[in-house]
Amino acid sequence: MNFCDNNEMNETKNFMMSNKNDDIVVDCDEYIDGNVFEKNTNMGNIYDENYNVDMKNDNLLSKLNDNISFTYTTNGQVEKQENEIKEKQNILHYQIYIDNDEDKYKYCSNSNLHKNEEEHEKGSPNNIYEELDNNLEKKYFYYNSDSKHCIDEKNETNDLENENVVTSMDVSYENVLNDNFIKSRSTSINYTDNSFVLNKENLKSSHHINGYYINDHDNIKSDIINDHDNIKSDIINDYDNIKGDKINEYDNIKSDKINDYDNIKSDIINDYDNIKSDKINDYDNIKSDKINDYDNIKSDKINDYDNIKSDKINDYDNIKSDKINHYDNIKSDKINDYDNIKSDKINDYDNIKSDKINDYDNIKYNDDSQINNNVSNKVNSPDDDPNTYEKDKKDIINCNIYEENKNNMNNIIHNDKENIHMVDTGKNEENNNIDNKNNDDINKVNVLTRVDTENYILNEENILPLHTNDDVTKLLDEINDLKNTIENMKKEKINLLSKFKAYTLNNKKELEELKIKCKNKEEQIKMYENKLQNKEDEIMNYVNEIQNKDKKIESYHIKLHNKEEEIMNYVNEIQNKEEEIIKYVNELQNSDVQKEKKELKTINEVLKNTNEKLEKEITSLLGEMKKIEEENKVLKIFKEEKNKINNEKVTQIKGDDINDDNDMKFKQILLDNKTFNKLLVNELNIVEENILFCFSIDKDKNRLLVCIKQNDDNFFVIPNCIFDEKFPGLQKKTESMIIQDIHEKEILELKNKQMNELYILKKEKEDIYKEYEEYKKKVTSLINETNYNYKNIEEKENEIKELNNTLNKYKEEMNNYKEEIIVINEKYKLLEIELCKEKNIRDQQNVGISDLKKKMLKEKIELEKKYKEQYEKETQQKINDMKIIFDNKEKILQDQIDDLLHKIEKLTFSNDEKTKTIENLQIYMDNDDNIMNQEGIQKNEKKQIIDNPINTDEKDLLNYIPDNHINSDLNHINSNVENDYVEKRNKNNVHLSKKETNYQHNINEQENDNNNNNNNNNNNNNVEKLKSINSTNTSIPIYPYEYKKIRKKLETYEILLNEQQEGKKKMTEEINSLKNQVKNYESINGNYQHIIYQKNILSNFIAQIPSRIQVDDYVSVIFNSFNFSNQEIEAINIKRSKK
C-alpha cells in the first residue's frame, strides 16, 4: 500500500470463490482518512465479519510514504480419523511492520489456541474453540535516528477457573531524553492481574457452518474452510474413480458413434489450441506493457472489469440458453431412435450404477449435502438421455479446472507472503487468468454445440438441399464475426479510455509533485531567512555590547586624565613649597643664632608630629593604591572573559542549528509516539505520590512531559495529554513541579544577587570618592601647617626623593595603562573586521538566495512549459490515433453491412416467380398424394418440427424437387451469389491491406474530418437503402425469419455507429474542458504570483515607516485587503520599531 501525501485513500477488493455446489463472495474494504486506518472483510454464504483497526496517532500514518506490510500466518496440523477432524495445534501470528526514511515500527504477536470437544444434546459432534491455554507473546520495536524503544511482553494464562494471569514485561530505552546524563534505561515488570478473565459465554460467540460451531478467529475459519475443500476434493476424486468404471462399460457400447465425434472434436480442439496459444502470446505482450501502469489504474480497471464481466456473463447466458434449447430440440429425435435400440444395455448399466452410488452415499459427510443432491438428481433422472455421459464429463472438467485454479492461487499466496504488493498483483493476474480460462471453456462448449448442429445438418443431405443450408451457415458465420468485431471494438475502446485516464492522472500527479517540491523549497528559503534575521539580531546585540564597552573604556580614560591632573597639581604644590623653604632658609641665615636654636627646638617637635601624621597618611595612601591596582586587575580579567564569551558565542551559533534539529526531532518522537506511550500507560498503577516532576517542551509551556515513579526502581516519561486521558482524577502540582520554572526562579535569584552586589560596589566607590575629597582637604590643611613649620632641609629633601619615586611609579603605571589601551583598540579593530566579514557573507547569502529564487521561478516556468507541450502533443497524437482507429473500423463495418445488404437483395425474388413456384407445387402435390405412405407422412411431420425458423409453405418449397430448367436457374443464381461474395471478399481484403498501409501516413486532422464526413454519408446511404427496401413490395424474402434477424442486427449496428460518434463528441468535449481547466489554472497561478509581488512591495514600504509615525488606520486597511498573517504583521512592526 502506498500512502499518499493527501492521507486519503479508499480501496475496495472483491474476491469470488466458486465450488461445485455453492459460491462464496468476500468483500474487503480498506479506508484511510487522516490518522485512522479501517479494514472491513465480509464473506457471504459462510459468515459475516467486521474487523476494524483504528490507529490514531498524530503524525505516524501521515509520514508513511515508503512501505507498509501486513502479514498474517497460521500453522496447523490436521489428521483424519474415522470421519472426524482433529486440530492438534493452531498458532495465530500477527505482524505489522512499518518502514520509513525517518521512523521504523514493528509489532509482533503470537498466540496458541486449543480446542475443547463436547457433545451436542442430540449426539452430533460440536467443536467449540476456547482459549483454555493462551501463551501470548508481544514484541514492540520502534526506533529512529535519535532513539530506540524495545518492549518484550509475555502473557501466560494456565487456569481460567482460578482466574490467575501472570504477565512479564521487559522495557529498554536508549537515548530517550537525548541528554548527556541519560543514555540508556531498562526496566522489568512482573505482576499478576486477577481482573483479566475470559468468560466462556464470550468465547462461545460463534457462527454455524454446516453443523460446526466455529470461534471468531480468522485462522480457525480459514483452516476449516481449507479442510472442507480438501474433503470435497477427496470425495469428488472417489466419485470420479467409481464413475470411471461405469463410463468404461458405457464407452464400449457407444464406441462407434463416439469415435466419429472424437475425431471431429480433436480437429476443433487443435484449432482452438492454436488460436489459444496465439491469444496467450498476445496477452503476455500486452500484459508486460500494462503492468507498469497497473498500480495507478488499479481501482478503475477493477470497476470496469466487474461491469464488463457482468455484461459478458449476461450475454453468454442468453446466447447459451438459446443454443441449448436449439440443440435439445435437434437431438430429441435421434435420442428416441437411440433409446429404442439400446434400452436393454442401459437398464443393466442403471442397476450397476445404483448399487455403487448407494455405497458412495454412505461414505459422504453431512457437509456435502449439495453434492448428494446433484448425484441423486443424476441417478433419479431418466437414463433415456444418452447425453448424461457428456454432462457428467463437463461437470468433472469444471471441477478439475476449479481445483487447479485454487491450487495455483494457494501456491502463489504462499510464495508471496513477504511482499504484499506482489501478492496483490499476483491475485489480479490470477483472476484475469481464471476469467480467460472460464471464457475458453465457454468457447469450447459453444464450439461443440455448433459442431453438433452442423453435423446434424450435414447428415440430412437427403432431406434438405445443400445450397440453401450453405448460404444460411455463411450468413450465421458472418454475423458471429461481426459480433466478435464489435466486442473487440468495445474492449479496445475501454482500454484506450483507461490509458487516457491513466495518462491524465499521471500528468496531474506530476504537476502536484512539482508544486509540493516548490512549496517545500519556498519553506526552506523562509527558514533560512528567519535564521539570517536571528543572526542579524545577535550581531546587533554584539555591536551594542561593544559600544557599551567603548563607553566604559572612555570613562576609564577620563578617570586616568583626572588622576594625571591631580598628580601635576601635587608636583606644582611641592615646587611652591620648595621655594618657600628656600625663602625660610635665607631668612634663617639673616636671623640670630639664638632665635634659631629656639625655633629649631619648636620646629623639631612640630616636625616629629607632622612626620608621624604624614607616615599615617602615606600608609593610608598606599592601601588605596593597592585597592586601585586590584580593581584594575579585576577589570582586565573581566575584559578577557568577555572576549572569550564573544568567541564562544560565534562558534556556538553554528552548533545551535544542529542541536535545535536534534531537540525538535526528539520532541516530535516523544509527542508523536502516542501508541507506544498508551501501551505503557495501560499497564501502570499511579498515585499522586508517584508523580516526580514535569518537563515542558514548548515555549508557551502548553505541552508537558510527566515523569512517573513506580516501585522505586522503574521510571516512566509520559506526555501530558495521555496522562490526562488515562488518569483524569490525579492532580499535578504544575507550578512547583515544572523543571523550567524552578531553574528560572533560581536564575532570577542569582540575577537579583548580582544586582545587589553591583549596587553595593557602586556605593563603596562613591564612599571612596568622598573620602578622597576629604583627604584632599586634610592634605591642604597639613600643607598650610607645614608652611609654618618646615625648617629642616635634609628631612624635606628625603621626602622629596620619596615623592619622586612615587611619581616614577605612577608614570610606569600610566605607560602600562597606555599599552593595555593599545591592545584593546587592536581587539576592537579585529572585531570590526569580523563584523565586516559577516556582513559580506550575509550579503553573499542574500545574493545566493535571490539567485536561487530566480532559478526556482525559471525552473517552474520551464517545467510548466515542457509538461504543457508534452501534454498537448501526446493528447493530440492520441486523439488522432483514436479518430483514425474508429474511422477505419467504421469503414470496415460499413463494408460488411453493404455486403450483407447485397446478399439480402440477392436472397429475395419477385411475385411472378413466387406464383410460378406455387403452381408447380400444386401440380407436384396432386401427383404425389396417392404415392405417400403413412410412415413417410409421420417422418415429414417430425422433420418439419425440427426446422424451427422455416415456415410450412417455405418447407414445401424446399422439399419440392423442381424441373431441370428450374434447377438450372437456381444453380445459376447460387453460383452468381457465390461469385459475388468471393469478389466482394477479395475487394475487402485488398481494401483493408491498402488501409493498413495508409494508417501511418494519414494522421492530419483534415483527413480525419473528411473520413468522418464520408462515414456519415455512408451511414445515410445505408439508411436510405433500407428504407427503399422497406418501401418496395415487389421483392419478397425467401427466409423471412432470418431476414428479420438480419434487419434487426443491421439496425443495432447503425445504433452502435451512432453511439461511437457520440462517444467521439464526448471525448472531444472532455478534452476541451481539460484544456480550459489548464488555462484557468495558469491564470490563477499568474494572479497569485502578482498578488504576492504586490504584497512584498507593500510590506517593505510599511517596514520603512518608523514607529513614531502613527499610520495604524491606513495600514490596517492594507492588511485586511491583502490578508496579511499575524506573523507577517509582527515582523513588519519589529522592523518599524528598529527605525
From Swiss-Prot:
Compositionally biased intervals (Low complexity) = 1009-1022
- Residue ranges annotated as compositionally biased, kind Polar residues, are 369-380
Q: What domain of life?
A: Eukaryota
Q: Which organism is it from?
A: Plasmodium falciparum (isolate 3D7)
**Biotechnological application?**
Possible candidate for an effective malaria vaccine as determined by epitope response in sera.
Q: Which residues form a coiled coil?
A: 472-648, 758-877, 1043-1084
Which positions fall inside the GRIP domain?
1084-1135
What is the protein's name according to its record?
GRIP and coiled-coil domain-containing protein
Give positions of region: Disordered.
366-388, 1004-1024
